[in-house]
């Protein structure tokens, strides 16, 4: 049996046990999963560090000098789609959107839906993408493109020839990944391939759906990832799906390997839209454990918890002009409680590296649901405020220290980027450094005026 056959048979990679050591089982009671969350966060998201503080001239600073150590960015990616940037109802809404997005998050998902992005063949809407990229750069926001391939709606101009349609799809993947190399280096390459042939997409995307059927799901995802990798060899490539059952692993992930059996993907993307019902801690943990067995990082790519009535059937009522899926006080309280629980569980799992919220504001949110972290009028919901307290408070490091022997300062902090500062003779000196899991030796920090 070759490596690919072994992976298909076992449903995991050679490093499948890496993320699952000493963790609770998926069928453990809710209390154990939650009670141990802070302990796991302390273990997996923080570390001890030693800083060697030197001056602008490269010489050690004197012992006894006090320094402040301030985190400026998380390594973990806390994100949201950024579809409404500069597209809110009023200039005031746009300003509020930008301010609150930047205050909370460090990761933005940009739209690349083919049928919208290239409404006329050969005329992609790159200008809008470049506008968002510039904003993200100005706010030190990591970017991701979503998605390069998804048979959800056929572009109107797509020829009704499956083989040609697939050629155009692969060409499109290459073009986007190559054009935005350096600006967007994280991509959802293929979206929702597990159940690619469900009835709704057969109606909306008959050409692409038939092209996938004819090519075969395994060949389709492999060729898509090869095209993206060739266009941007250093990109982080995700497979993404709403299916969290074994079918995703068996039908797609286990197929997404080279002839020698090595994964063609870098990250496994998991959608978690909870319009109908909130996931229990056990279900959330089970999803993490199921896909961590592949030995690759996990991104929760599309997370929704509504702040109003729950139920997928409510989207069907949108045709009624008198119906509004509204946010409520009770729903907002429930949303906040569930969001904090969900994020604590995910942040405590060592395989998870990113969480992306789906729709920052209720304005034109997907399914017209009250899914935002901020309301229709751009005021923050309790969920936003609670996340801010976690991400920039409880999970954020601010520390003081005194330079000791050898110009060293010891501290413990969350992984991410930091600024160190001190004052000498009325002058403020600052320097920066990065702390991550790979940091083992003393980090040299040069302080300058």
Q: Predicted regions span which residues?
A:
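Acidic-and-aromatic substrate-binding clefts and catalytic sites of carbohydrate-active enzymes
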Residues: 84-93, 115-127, 153-155, 194-198, ...
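Short Pro-Gly-centered beta-turn/loop motif in secreted/extracellular proteins
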Residues: 96, 100-103, 410-417
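Glycoside hydrolase catalytic-domain groove-lining segments
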Residues: 130-137, 211-239, 247-320, 343-347, ...
